[in-house]
A protein has these predicted regions:
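Vicinal oxygen chelate
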Residues: 23-28, 102, 106-152, 174-176, ...
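Mid-chain, structured segments of secreted extracytoplasmic proteins
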Residues: 64-109, 114
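Short, solvent-exposed beta-strand edge segments and adjacent coil->beta transition regions
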Residues: 30-34, 86-90, 145-149, 204-208, ...
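Bacterial N-terminal signal peptides
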Residues: 8-19
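Core segments of cupin and vicinal oxygen chelate
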Residues: 27-77, 119-123, 127, 151-190, ...
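Bacterial N-terminal signal peptides that target proteins for export
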Residues: 1-9
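Short hydrophobic/aromatic beta-strand micro-patches
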Residues: 38, 92-94, 151-153, 210-212
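Short proline/glycine-enriched turn/loop motifs at strand-loop junctions of beta-rich domains
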Residues: 95-98, 213-217
């Protein structure tokens, strides 16, 4: 099953194929790009993650990290609401030795809210809250190390899954045959749990999630045709390693979503 998924992702990344038959025929698949977290001191948070979770500095900046092809970026936010219970509830990272990782982050100031437990048929997992208010799931999935998933909350998970699949494509499948999800190029899972109440991501410690736009104009046209609500105009930003173009759209239940076009030579 894992090899089949890897093959499917490789084809999607190379050719930007349309979504599977279960998705809309016109839907294309977008590569997952980043998460942006709001913290009091972005460079301090980035260094904490680099030392304790992993990743490497990227874009010539020390306020962001690269995990595979996914960026974890930190912006200034002094009064951000902790992510727990929000529409973007937590992020997942996978390690070869979960027990050692949990002890490392505990010693570095994280709060371990759920100790390591082995879920039969799935993997070992634990939950922490980092020193900046972000809820994280740490897991031991040898088949998928590094940045692993984004976990949302929704009053209607199936409707929310349908929106993301229709909007951004991906492979709709089950994680280890246990959890419904969408797997995106970049090897990132989108998981959704049922919740009667959430709060929007903007203003929370996990401020927004993001997908890659291979071409901004084509992406805007594609999303407009799907009836997606835009919440900003596209604009450029110059980074030490190139220029990006980005804009924001509204996701279900207050999820803030960014689309980013990166220069061709940017990782």
């Amino acid at each position: 099953m894992y090899n089949k998924i890897k093959t499917g992702l490789a084809l999607l990344m190379l050719f930007c194929l349309p979504g599977l038959a279960s998705a809309q025929a016109e839907s294309k698949t977008y590569m997952y790009d980043h998460v942006h977290m709001a913290v009091p001191e972005p460079e301090v948070a980035a260094q904490w993650y680099k030392d304790n979770i992993g990743g490497e500095f990227i874009d010539g900046r020390t306020d962001r990290l690269l995990f595979g092809t996914t960026r974890i970026m930190f912006l200034n936010g002094d009064a951000a609401t902790p992510s727990t219970g929000g529409v973007v509830d937590h992020l997942g990272f996978s390690f070869t030795d979960l027990a050692a990782t949990v002890e490392r982050v505990r010693a570095a100031g994280a709060t371990v809210s759920s100790e390591v437990r082995d879920v039969p048929g799935l993997f070992k997992l634990a939950f922490i809250v980092d020193p900046f208010g972000n809820r994280m799931e740490l897991i031991e999935d040898a088949q998928h190390l590094g940045f692993h998933h984004v976990h949302l909350r929704s009053a209607d998970p199936q409707a929310t899954f349908a929106w993301y699949e229709a909007t951004f494509g991906g492979i709709r499948t089950n994680l280890r045959g246990r959890m419904d999800g969408i797997l995106y190029p970049g090897n990132v899972w989108l998981l959704i749990s049922q919740a009667d109440a959430t709060f929007p991501s903007q203003g929370a410690s996990i401020d927004h999630i993001g997908w890659r736009a291979l071409d901004s104009a084509e992406t805007i046209a594609d999303l407009q045709a799907k009836g997606v609500e835009f919440t900003s105009e596209p604009r450029d930003m110059t980074l030490p390693n190139g220029i990006i173009n980005f804009f924001y759209v509204q996701g279900p239940e207050g999820a803030r979503i960014e689309l980013v076009h990166r220069a061709a030579d940017m990782r």
